[in-house]
Amino acid sequence: MSTTEPSPENDRDPQPTTISTPTSTNAKLLKKIPAIPFRHSDKEGEDEQAKTDEVTTELAGEGPMSHDSPEILAPSSLGLNHIRTKSSPAPSPLRFSSATPLISPGQDDKDVAKEKPRVGVVDARADARARWPIPPHQPDQGKKVQWSQSKSQRVPANSNPGVESTHVGLAKETQSPRFQAILRVTSGRKKKAHDIKSFSHELNSKGVRPFPVWRSRAVGHMEEIMAAIRTKFDKQKEDVDADLGVFAGYLVTTLESTPESNKELRVGLEDLLVEARQCATMPASEFWLKCEGIVQKLDDKRQELPMGGLKQAHNRLLFILTRCNRLVQFRKESGYVEEHILGMHQLSDLGVYPEQMVEISRQQDLLREKEIQKINEKQNLAGKQDDQNSNSGADGVEVNTARSTDSTSSNFRMSSWKKLPSAAEKNRSLNNTPKAKGESKIQPKVYGDENAENLHSPSGQPASADRSALWGFWADHQCVTYDNSMICRICEVEIPVVHVEEHSRICTIADRCDLKGINVNLRLERVAESLEKILESWTPKSSVTPRAVADSARLSNSSRQEDLDEISQRCSDDMLDCVPRSQNTFSLDELNILNEMSMTNGTKDSSAGSLTPPSPATPRNSQVDLLLSGRKTISELENYQQINKLLDIARSVANVNVCGYSSLDFMIEQLDELKYVIQDRKADALVVETFGRRIEKLLQEKYIELCGLIDDEKVDSSNAMPDEESSADEDTVRSLRASPLNPRAKDRTSIEDFEIIKPISRGAFGRVFLAKKRATGDLFAIKVLKKADMIRKNAVESILAERNILISVRNPFVVRFFYSFTCRENLYLVMEYLNGGDLFSLLRNLGCLDEDMARIYIAEVVLALEYLHSVNIIHRDLKPDNLLINQDGHIKLTDFGLSKVGLINSTDDLSGESSLGNSGFFAEDGSKAQHSQGKDSRKKHAVVGTPDYLAPEILLGMGHGKTADWWSVGVILFEVLVGIPPFNAETPQQIFENIINRDIPWPNVPEEISYEAHDLINKLLTENPVQRLGATGAGEVKQHHFFKDINWDTLARQKAMFVPSAEPQDTSYFMSRYIWNPEDENVHGGSDFDDLTDTCSSSSFNTQEEDGDECGSLAEFGNGPNLAVKYSFSNFSFKNLSQLASINYDLVLKNAKESVEASNQSAPRPET
């Protein structure tokens, strides 16, 4: 086997040089592949194997190598795979390799036979691996790019010296620990017997382990989900029956000790005894239908009672029954029962209950639909042209994962309250008519900025002259040259800083064309369609005349907008059919807005009239519209013929469907033409280079697929061949498929892309780690969630909801989200790392805060909730742990979507410490013993969490809306000022009673808290959600006199009172509410870092495709029905392009600011 060592190459694109095939027939298959050189000066790399050795020993779990170890043996001489460190692009035999052919042309069968004895020395496992050489790894890869650093963008083509070693030396090296580590990491897929059934979700680093009882729910299948919920309800009903038996015994004992003269108490206790007996003897199917009504009536009676033993008995009975009622409510919130009930709390006070309201609900729905239809018809007649011009914009998509309800259009039944609304509240509710609601529903939602709608209309499009000025902003204001470069956070390729803006837009379009899960031909077609639309919108420079320019200037904005609408429609709908548009919307603020933000601290309107700083990635227009809006200037940096040539190459490669050697020859010719197109580009990192590299990657993928198909046919027809030749063909097929060149494995984001630094915190559903992206050096916080835990806790939909919300939101007070991906056992969410810790940790250190500091924090929470509620998102899990502090000292909300499932799972926690004894009132001896064992089991597996911050309507299992968040704000404000939550107690049952009884230990006023703070907390903690402050929106909260000194317009830009002084990688500000005990992690199969390394190792991830992210059939793990549906996480992986582009902009703005400051400091001061 003839091999040559790779030359030290540029750190941007290290490339392999050779591959060998075992037969002369295969030698005709591959030809010499030309290189695509860069246009800058040559620079040779240094220390080519230093980083590779570090990563190898780290992945293999061994310590650092000794400095006096023997001379490094190049793994390429042993036929090993490339070690995927993800700090540089994976190697390609088809890219930039004109200096060395894929196979030595003069090599024949004899040469192959001579080389076989050398390969035989290696372990048998090496025969199954691909024979690609390991490219050099530059030491500066994976580090942040310094702005003063000039990087070469050209790959040298120097000759590579061969590796000379004897058979004895080779045998000695194969026994070294370092070689064994490399062998373990780079070993390919191993064959396994077909008769062995593998449950990959049951495996961890230590082998097979059993999970606790699985509770199955299938995502997206209504029947299975309903059956799973009912199964859990039936099991919960058994526990409730046992608790009711104990409660009935308590009532009998109380009745015996109550004197006959106290008739009122005796009658009340007897009624509760009858109610408890009826509930306990009621079948589960009947109780499922009547549970909500029973809880509703009991709560109405409870509110009429004075404090005393009878009210306490009602509290205890409600505490028991709401465990089942919350499951019923969870089923309604999941969208499987559509009950439109409009009365909320006032109707239950009048004696009107769900069975009486169905007809009223239907009539109201019909009236509301008629009103909305009339409004739609009027608006269609009045503004038909404007509606057409705004169709192509990236309209915000309402996120309705957490259902929003209000006083007149609720899908849920809320708890009743004794107090009727005051006159002011009635006036407020009268103004909230169905017509007004219909108008608000049909308004287009644009995240973060309602004024962004203007950008979709012709009036919102800047003129050509304005575009030219805008496109020149970065170069004019920063004066950057090609000497300054940075790594693009989208494609992780080095680009000139001067072209960051244009490249970010172009790179996003190219990345979206290359969606995962679609065959390569379709992706090439999408690339071709994008290029075709770009060509249709641009005028070739050679045909531009003064008359043509004048005619172009006179084009109507409406006709231009129609063209852009068509482009947006094809690029947004056709290219993104696999992922919702709201999850892929990429847009960048117009440069004048960015200029205003950076130079004059400009602001933008939020949903309720307040002004907050614009987000760098607030969706406004589609990315194709924004790209084409500057085409007059971009055409000076691009070439029409080159783009047209890229289009022809993409189409021609996509149309290659014949499996044969002629197709491979044709693709090599196309690659040669592609090389010259990219080489002759007029500017770096723009359309020609960015789309050219994307086409090149797709061409590689299709080339490898065709090679695999050809070799598959040869292997199938080689039964009559000698064993040696047949085995060689098998190795060739394996080489093509298992090679790290496989683009589908290379392009997927994985945990290997990140270097795990340290754990940050632990929550009820997962753990958070501090990590660094190897390619860029950026710090992120990675939330790690076990698939098995998510399924067992019925949290699959919850984590998907959190992911979707994080993708959709754009607000300075909400944490930013960048990636989501999976491996065999874990789910990963990658978010921005905020080194200031959280509010809970701050309170643990300081005890409590003064009012001025608390006022700022609560005001920022109010702005965050104002934004979330404007896009129909209810947080429902607000607590100090979920309020993070960024490096500037401002608040950011996190942990979305977990409150709903977290509430259901916390049912066991809310069961309290009441003992069941040995005698139940309704239960028999067998069921008593079984229930006692079940309670012990629940204590062991109880879900961590606290109900301190939950609103009473959530605890009672009733419907709830946005006002539930305002209740939590009141609890947080009390804790921030006093030091403890207002309803804190030793047991969950006592906390439950304190909340529904509104038992608040008020501090002295005004000695300990001010009158304004007391009044705000009192109004936020109002039992009736309709009368609670914030019921009509965040405006009334912001107008409270507690916030009289707050400037809402500039709050996000004000300097915070507490600014973290920690280093970027410091996690000392985080103090987890839950005890971190690594010794307990053996239940889950190892330590914290085992989840990130062993279970998601290099070899397992390379062979794990997106469609294979499943947890297998759950029929064998649940007590529910026999499900044939698999839990699939195939759509979980996501790359948030808009937020990654915002990092590019943040870096450029930061560099511009530092340059201005440096110039100001160096400028001579005028003499006075």
From Swiss-Prot:
This is Probable serine/threonine protein kinase IRE. It is an enzyme of class 2 (transferase). It holds the Pfam family Pkinase. Its EC number is 2.7.11.1. PROSITE patterns: AGC_KINASE_CTER (PS51285), PROTEIN_KINASE_DOM (PS50011), PROTEIN_KINASE_ST (PS00108). It comes from Arabidopsis thaliana. It catalyses: L-seryl-[protein] + ATP = O-phospho-L-seryl-[protein] + ADP + H(+); L-threonyl-[protein] + ATP = O-phospho-L-threonyl-[protein] + ADP + H(+). Keywords: ATP-binding, Growth regulation, Kinase, Metal-binding, Nucleotide-binding, Phosphoprotein, Serine/threonine-protein kinase, Transferase, Zinc, Zinc-finger. InterPro entries: AGC-kinase_C (IPR000961), Kinase-like_dom_sf (IPR011009), Prot_kinase_dom (IPR000719), Ser/Thr_kinase_AS (IPR008271), Ser_Thr_kinase_AGC (IPR050236). GO terms for biological process: unidimensional cell growth. Residues 16-25 have a biased composition (Low complexity). Disruption phenotype: Reduced root hair length. The gene is IRE.
